[in-house]
Amino acid sequence: ATYLPPEQLISMVAEFAEAYKNDRPTLYTQARDLQNNRKEHARQSVAGDELEESMVDRVSRIVVGSYDAVNGGFGSEPKFPNASVIRFINHRYRTTGEDFFAAMLIKTLDGMSDGQVLDNSDGGFFRHCAQADWTQPQHEKMLEDNLGLAREFLNAAILLDRPQYRETAKQTIDYLMSQLYDPDTSGFRGSQGAHSEYFSMSPDRRSKAAPPAPDPSCYANSNGLAVTVLLDTAWKLGDASLQTTALQILDRLDSMAQADTFSHVYSEDGPSDVPAFFTDWAWLLAALMQAHGNTASESYLERAVAVAQIMVDRFFDQKGGGFFDIEDQPEGIGHLQIREKVLAENTVAAQAFVRLHQSTRNEDYRQIAEATLIAFVETFREQGEFAADYGLAVHLLKNDMVEVTVEGRLEDAGCQELIAAAARLPQPNLDIKTVMAAEGDTVARAHVCLDTVCLPPVDDPAELAEAVAGLTKQQESPFQDIFQVFPGN
């Protein structure tokens, strides 16, 4: 079950107790069968055929097949606001310019904004709706969902020139900062409780009532995601406080990693005894690479290299490719004996290793990313539309990275316009970095590089796309002098 009200949970526990008392052998047989099935499924994630860019189109067909053309969104009831699928559609619209993807985005984001899945009073998105038309919400608010949706609403606002999506993104970030962020812990709580009575109140009544309490714990993987989202949105929204918060969270996560106390769960009392899982390390690596891209600090890159080595040593399958979800536990009980490869967290790692390869020029990192994605060639279709991030990761790996570094002041409108222009570029593997301009330098500039070839800086957003198009075309004819094509400013 996705969610059980207290009375249903109590009833289910009573049924379990009765079955254990009266039919224990059957329960043991079922448990053994389940464990054997999981072991068999885990063996399927091994190196498959060669990775092909055509897989991006296959994922596109899967995602489009799940699209709800009546209500927007993907899948049937219960309807989840799946940020990873929206991210993939944003990516496909940016890289193809096809109106069909734009229509899917608008139908989906408008449906969510106008429906009951968005809390228009306090801000933030609920976990899901019981009905396909975005009604009858289940009132829990999840950190990961809201982070991903804030990022994708903001990206869609830029791609589609729809300022209302930007406002929704900002309101969602404001909700997270006011309701889930704990400055004493330097982390976001995992969720806000599903208090249907409170969320059914009018805004006036809510203002006089206590909001539902948040989860008392912070989780390393979702806070790694928070770092990447806040760093990205800080520059797009022109809000320096978001970058400050992101780096404080990253410092907390990485300090635990360096002290060998990195835990999946932490609170103001410190890290718990629950060890970090692979997903936590994957998101830490992604956060370090995002911080390196947004600050140009080499210390984050150095730490990323160290974290990548830990991930390979503890979790990587040297024979079949891909990363296991937990460390090897020969003495583990039950399902803890089974090391599985989870597609979602492996795609996070693959994308981070692609960025690490670009920053270090160490070919080993690219090979690890490729081996990770190849491990799911035979099984990604089983995930349905949830394979969206896999399609995105394949698209990144199979294309050369175009790196756009925007140099400016975070709060400057001209800098934000350049970043928006960069975010509209159609190149599949696009890495937008930022550098704070020197004091007194009031002109924002974009520096564009493809592999080892870089252009003179561009300060006009309208010229950025033309410059990048010229550079990618120039790479097809490497004997021409690029400084004759792009004489600079």
Please place each PLM-identified region on the residue numbering.
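"A position-specific structural signal for the A-helix of alpha-solenoid helical repeats
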Residues: 152, 229, 287, 352-355
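Long, polar/charge-rich, low-hydrophobicity segments
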Residues: 179-185, 193, 197-202, 212, ...
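Contiguous, well-ordered alpha-helical segments that form the cores/surfaces of helical PPI scaffolds
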Residues: 87, 283-286
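Short secondary-structure subsegments characteristic of cysteine-rich extracellular domains
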Residues: 246-253
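Replace the tail clause
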Residues: 1-241, 248, 373-489
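TPR-repeat structural position
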Residues: 102, 166, 243, 301, ...
